[in-house]
Amino acid sequence: MKLESALGAHDVAITDVAAVLHTHCHIDHAGQDDRFPMTTPVVMNRRELEHSASGLMGGQYPPEYVKHHIDRLHAPGALRLLDLELSGPDEIFDGIVCEAAGGHTEGSMNILVETAAGTACICGDVIYDIQNQIVEPWHQALAFEPQTTGNHTMRKREEKAAMKRALNRDFVLPLHDFPARVEGGRVVARLKHEVPGPEFDVAEFAAEVATPVAAV
């Protein structure tokens, strides 16, 4: 879906966007920043910009993405860099807070949004698949022990800690799966396109949606 169409579905124009927040800057997450005017700040963790140019994850950071972000670095007001590992959580707008994620990439951040039903954690790719990593994690015997993926630059223990941190909120929203409601670190319900919104039984949802669909 084109950027204009995706925004238009919510009656939003490109020029209406106050800021663009990136959990991380991989190829499937940070494209089309160049479509936004330089007066619209792109917000990311400073460590993510550094990591994107390090070569550690190769083609997952396309050169045109990295070059555009460097261009923004030298345009006043076009890029906002956070230092979340040092500063702690940073409130970007009223009710929207960014925190260091601690997983997937060295500079990934969680975006915490206050809703009428509690805090929603947009966790990027710290979690890919709620059913197979959290609800019924592959090859894990310990209680509340998530399964990591193979796509990360952090140590496995850091990955597990990052997943547990993301689950320490009322809702968790991975960017390659549907959301979930969480209580005490355990997934208690699944949702689709609204948070908060209609909730579905975890087991029934898993049977209905065998293959996760990318969420916007």
Q: Positions of the model-derived regions?
A:
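Short catalytic/ligand-binding loop motif for oxyanion handling, primarily in non-cytosolic enzymes
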Residues: D28-G31, H51-A53, M109, I130, ...
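Active-site metal-binding loops of divalent metal-dependent hydrolases
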Residues: C25, E48, G103-T105, G124-V126, ...
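Catalytic core of the metallo-beta-lactamase
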Residues: T15, G31, M38, A75-I134
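Cap/insert and terminal regions of metallo-dependent hydrolase folds
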Residues: M1-K2, A117-V216
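Metallo-beta-lactamase
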Residues: M1-V12, D16-D28, R46-A100, Q147-D170, ...
